[in-house]
Structures are given as C-alpha cells and as structure tokens.
C-alpha cells in the first residue's frame, strides 16, 4: 500500500494542466527548476604551508598598504593574501620603492627626494658665507681708499688758494703737487705743454737769496713781485685743477673701456657667436676652394 502511495505521489507542477483551473504555483514550477544549488567549496593550494596560512590573515587589512606600495610587481592580478611575505622576513627599503613598477604611485618618496634636492649642502653654505665676508672686507678697504683720496683732493685747493694768509708754508707743497700732476701723460695734452710749463721758485728762497729786498728802497719792487707771484700762482692752481679733472676723466674712460672689454670676453653669447662665425667662415672658404 505504501509502495503504491509512493508511486502515486507526483509533484503538483508535474501534473498535466487542466485548462483555466491551473494554479500560479504550477506555472512557476514548470518554468523554474526548484532545486537547491551546489554549495561553494574552497580548494587549498598545495604549495602554501600551514605557517603561511596561520600568519597571513585571509582578508586584507590596512597593514597591507605598505606592502602593496613596496612591492615590485603588479598587484591587481593576484590575491594579496597568497603572495604576501612573512612579517619577520619582509623589510621594506627605498630602493625597492624607487624601482617598483606598480600602478599606485609612491608620493611620499617623491616628496622626500624633492626636499633633499631643495636643501643646500653645508659646504656650499660655508663657502658663501666666506665669500660674503671677503666681499665686505674688500668693500671696507675700497671705502677707506676712496675716503683718503677725497681728503687729499679737498686739502690741495686750500693750500693752493691765492687768498691764503700764510704764503711761505703752502708753496713747497704746491711745488710737489704741481710736479706730480704735470708728470701725468694724457692723450689730449701733448708733452710740449708739459715742457713749456716753467718751474716756479719758492718765495722764501727768493727772499733769502736777495738780502737787499728787505731794505726800504726795494719795498715797491718786492710788492710788485709779490703781486706777480700771486697772479702766477692763481694761474698755476687753475691749471693744476684742470689737470686733475682731465686725469679723473682719463681714469674713468680707461675703467669703462676695460669693463666693456671684460664683459664682452666673458659673455657666453659673444663667445658662441664668434665660434659660429669662424666655423661658417671656414666652411665658405672650403666651398669656394672646391668650386675653383
């Protein structure tokens, strides 16, 4: 009886349809296979040891980020938990990060390299400080020299002024300064003018050489000679001033010409143009010789 019942038992959706009396359950059963799906099974790889499986977590965590960044190979085509090295054997190094070929860029390493390039070295800093100290020392020396020249130039017209009360003291100074200024050679002034300038004797020597000048009968002659000497001194002082001005102009012109020549020699553009000009000139000469 039970066997007959088991054989008679038929699923509802396998019965033949009977017109409009067919239920929705029968329609779903005929269209969908109502059978359980196979369970998912995981296969263990034979090459992985038990120690590696214990040490590595099955799910990647935030601790894997450093390993992913320091890995040499691409990591998008494999399972990270299978190829991650052991914690006690893995030691990241900057060389691995620089030589890796990963899709994720290492921004931290590039920033560190840029900072290292921007920081100047200690020897360069010490050298620049030494150069600055040397330049300041040279500037102070130049300032002292210029100040001494200015002081000497300001003292010379006072001694050479014709209205000075003491005539005997500035005359020897005038003789020495006059000789030094007239000995300078300028392109605008010829040597004949220097030769034609007579040497003026000092007034004390004239008075000592002629003792009769102190007598009352020679006072008029002495006064006239002193006036002539004052006029000649004023002319000589103006001539000395003009010589000093011309001397300064000549020095400035020489320094400007020297600076221009040095700038032209040191300018890289001038050197390159000169080399190119010579090169093309040689090429043109060779072409002309071949044509002839």
From Swiss-Prot:
Protein modification: Phosphorylated by AMPK. Upon stress, phosphorylation by AMPK is sufficient to induce mitochondrial fragmentation.
Membrane topology category: Peripheral membrane protein
Annotated GO biological process: aerobic respiration; mitochondrial fission
Domain of life: Eukaryota
Record's keyword annotation contains GTP-binding: no
Residue positions where Phosphoserine is found in the record: 41, 103, 110, 224-225, 238, 261, 273
Signal peptide location: none
Family named by the database record: Belongs to the MTFR1 family.
Role, per record: Mitochondrial protein required for adaptation of miochondrial dynamics to metabolic changes. Regulates mitochondrial morphology at steady state and mediates AMPK-dependent stress-induced mitochondrial fragmentation via the control of OPA1 levels.
PANTHER family tied to this protein: MITOCHONDRIAL FISSION REGULATOR 1-LIKE, PROTEIN OF UNKNOWN FUNCTION DUF729
Name of the protein in its database record: Mitochondrial fission regulator 1-like
Lineage of source species: Eukaryota, Metazoa, Chordata, Craniata, Vertebrata
Gene (name only): Mtfr1l
């Amino acid at each position: 009886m039970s066997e007959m019942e088991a054989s008679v038992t038929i699923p509802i959706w396998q019965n033949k349809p009977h017109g409009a009396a067919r239920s929705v359950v029968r329609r779903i059963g005929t269209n969908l296979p109502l059978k359980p799906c196979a369970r998912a099974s995981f296969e263990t790889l034979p090459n992985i040891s038990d120690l590696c499986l214990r040490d590595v977590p099955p799910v990647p965590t935030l601790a894997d980020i450093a390993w992913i960044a320091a890995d040499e190979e691409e990591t998008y085509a494999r399972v990270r938990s299978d190829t991650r090295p052991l914690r006690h054997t893995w030691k990241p190094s900057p060389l691995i990060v620089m030589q890796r070929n990963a899709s994720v860029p290492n921004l931290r390493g590039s920033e560190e390299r840029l900072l290292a390039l921007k920081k100047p070295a200690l020897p360069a800093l010490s050298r620049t400080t030494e150069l600055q100290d040397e330049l300041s020392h040279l500037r102070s020396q130049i300032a002292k020299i210029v100040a001494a020249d200015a002081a000497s130039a300001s003292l010379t017209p006072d001694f050479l002024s014709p209205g000075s009360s003491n005539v005997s003291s500035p005359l020897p100074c005038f003789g020495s300064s006059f000789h030094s200024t007239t000995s300078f050679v300028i392109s605008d002034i010829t040597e004949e003018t220097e030769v034609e300038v007579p040497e003026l004797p000092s007034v004390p020597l004239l008075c000592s050489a002629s003792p009769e000048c102190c007598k009352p009968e020679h006072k008029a002659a002495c006064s006239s000679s002193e006036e002539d000497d004052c006029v000649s001194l004023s002319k000589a002082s103006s001539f000395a001033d003009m010589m000093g001005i011309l001397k300064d102009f000549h020095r400035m012109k020489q320094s400007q010409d020297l600076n221009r020549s040095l700038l032209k020699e040191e300018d890289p553009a001038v050197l390159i143009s000169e080399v190119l000009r010579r090169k093309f000139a040689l090429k043109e000469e060779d072409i002309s010789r071949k044509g002839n």
